[in-house]
Amino acid sequence: VQLAQKLGPLKHHCEQAVSRLIEVDQWLSIARWAHHDRCVMPEIVDHGVWLEEGRHVLLGLEPDPVTYGLGKAAIEGDQQSLALLTGANSGGKTTLLECLAHACILAHMGLPVPAKKARIGKVETLHILAKAGGTQSAGALEQTLVELAAVVSDPTPKLILADELEAITEPGAGARIIAGMLLAAEA
């Protein structure tokens, strides 16, 4: 009882010390991960996203680094705000989109990104539009267009990553429809 009476006034200080130690451990874990995965603090810019030797954080292997960017963050002469990625199946398109999304999310959390250099634009929202499970149907196309219309009509800064949307309708038609909507929204 006497020991409890002596230690009672220290309870609040002990709780604060444990809380601070947990926070230090959190930041040390982040630093250890960032060092191990060769991450850098990104430069925060007004618009776009650009990674030099960016790497996907969740592949579980040493990925091939990629240099890619969009918008004003990209290297000079390659600053378009809209890009259409094409290529063979298993060519890395989805992995690239995921890599850009991861970098954007990490940067907006104030964390380092797995890249040699990075410039990340300020965005209010990140939208990932991907093919829903199942086959192509008018309902899937209609639902995607309704979602996309809501996204592009919102004037806040955003990053939109769309993956395999052409699979929801005839080959090529979905990509043309969606690209047309994005270009109209950009105008």
Regions found by a protein language model. Give the residues of each.
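Post-Walker A alpha-helix
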Residues: L96-E98, H102
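Post-Walker A helix-loop "phosphate-sensing" segment adjacent to the P-loop in P-loop NTPases
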Residues: H102-K116
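Substrate-engagement module of ASCE P-loop NTPases
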Residues: A179-A187
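Short glycine-rich substrate-engagement loop in P-loop NTPases that contacts/grips substrate
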Residues: A132-V152
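Hydrophobic anchor at the beta1->P-loop junction of P-loop NTPases
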Residues: L85, N89
